[in-house]
Each structure stands twice: as C-alpha cells, then as structure tokens.
Amino acid sequence: MKKEVTKQVYAYVVCVICLGVGIIFLCVGIYGVIKIISPEFTIHKWEWKKVATFQSFKTDWEKTEGAVQLTDEELRIRWQDKKEIAIMGEKRDGMQNLTNMLICFVIILPIFIIHWRLARKLREE
C-alpha cells in the first residue's frame, strides 16, 4: 500500500513539474510570436536607439572616432541596412524561441502523459 502511494506521489510530482516547465516555455513561445509579429516592440532599447531614426544613426556615426565621412544619402543606405538587420535578427530570435517551445512540448508531453496515466492507474488500484 505504502509503495503505491509513493509511486503515485512521484507520478503527480513529475506531472506538476512538466506543467510548470510547459507554462514557462509557453510564455517563451508567446514572446517569440510577439517578436516575429512586432520586432520593433521587443528589440532591446539600446539597439533600437541606434537605428530608430536616421538622425540618431547619423549622430552616432559622426561621434564614432575614425568614421569615414559619407554623404547623407550614403548614410541613409547604411542606416536602412542596419535597421533591417536589427529587425531581421529580432525576428530570428523569435523563431528560435518558438522552436525551443515546440521542442520542449515534444519532450514534455509524452513524459506528462505517461506519468499521468501511471498516477491514474495507481489511484484506481
């Protein structure tokens, strides 16, 4: 009798742990979706300040020691490239978060199901 109770407690503890990890990775996945949909919203503040406006990019460029003197048009092209790269990087991070969530669920779901069935079987006995 005591052995079955111990096994049942073990099974429920594993289920609770799986649920906790699943909830954490669900949050990571939701944040990943937000990063994909609106990368400007989730990008780091210090990185966004560099590329948010052309003027801020130009000011940073001019402050850089040893920076090549470029025309406004050349600077604008570099600014657009840098902004696009920052946004693409944020979207890529979002895709990685989503992938991590899916991998976690692929691993956790069978563990949860096995232990949930074990706990139910032990409870019925």
Q: Where are the regions that the model predicts?
A:
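Juxtamembrane interface at the cytosolic side of transmembrane helices
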Residues: 1-15, 103-125
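Perimembrane helix-loop junctions in membrane proteins
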Residues: 28-43, 115-125
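Intrinsically disordered, low-complexity regions enriched in Ser/Pro/Gly/Gln/His and often acidic
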Residues: 16-19, 54, 72, 109
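Membrane-helix interfacial "entry" motifs
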Residues: 1-4, 8, 12, 85, ...
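Alpha-helical rod/repeat scaffolding segments in eukaryotic adaptors/tethers
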Residues: 12, 16-19, 23, 43, ...
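N-terminal membrane-entry
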Residues: 93-107
